[in-house]
Amino acid sequence: AVLIGHVAGHTSTIRVGAGGIMLPNHAPLQVAEQFGTLASLYPGRIDLGLGRAPGTDQAATRALRRYYQGADEFPNDVMELLQYFEQAAPGQQVRAVPGAGVEVEAWILGSSLFGAQLAATLGLPYAFASHFAPDMLEQASAIYRQKFRPSARLTKPHVMLALNVVAAESDAEETRLCTSQQ
C-alpha cells in the first residue's frame, strides 16, 4: 500500500493498485482501511487485486495472521472485505475508517478455475495469472464468462491477463531468455 500511495501521489490520471494482496495473510478490515485511505486520497484511481495463495511458508503465514484457518476462508474474507467498502449500516459494529462508502475496484486474482468461478459468482473483474498456469487460460476465461453474474460493482465480465513477455535484440537472445524462464 505504501508504494501505491507513492506512485499515485506522483501521477494524476493513471489507475494504481496491488497486483496481489494475498488475503490469507491479512485481516479484511486492515486491507479495507488501507485501500480506503488510498481511495480517499486518490478517488477513482485505486485497484485492489485479491489472491488466495499464501505467498510464503507456514511459519511466516502464522506470524502474519495467527488465527487464519486456510485458503477455504478466502471467499468469506473477500465478501467481508467488500462489505467494508459499502456504506455503513445503522448499528454496524465494525466499520472501515476510511473505507465505508469509498470506491475501490476489487479484482479476484487467480491461476485456477477456483478464482474464475469466485470472480464470476461475486460479479467482480478477474485477473488470470497465465504466467503461472498458461494451460488453464482458455478454460478459466470461459468459465468466468459463462458463470458471470452482474453485480453492483460490474455489469459484464472483465478479464485481465498477466503474461510473460520477452523482448531481445536477437532471436538467439530471445530464445536464451525464454528458456531461462522455464
Give the location of each predicted region.
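Active-site-adjacent structural elements that line small-molecule/cofactor binding pockets in enzymes
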Residues: 1-182
